[in-house]
Amino acid sequence: MELTEKILSELVLRIENHFNLDPMDALEAVALSKLGNRIAQGEYDHSLTLDQLAEELYREVATAR
């Protein structure tokens, strides 16, 4: 599994736990997010830690909900 896939997989788990979502809803939230798309395309700030990416994603998902 490449790094991008590992990052996205970890973010799905974090979204699932943070928002108490079922796995498919968490996957959908990450897949539909702007950050998730940027990560998938490698167009994100690579200096950010996984925790920082998760915090940004939490904000984005919370706003979308």
PLM region spans:
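C-terminal alpha-helical interaction appendages
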Residues: 1-65
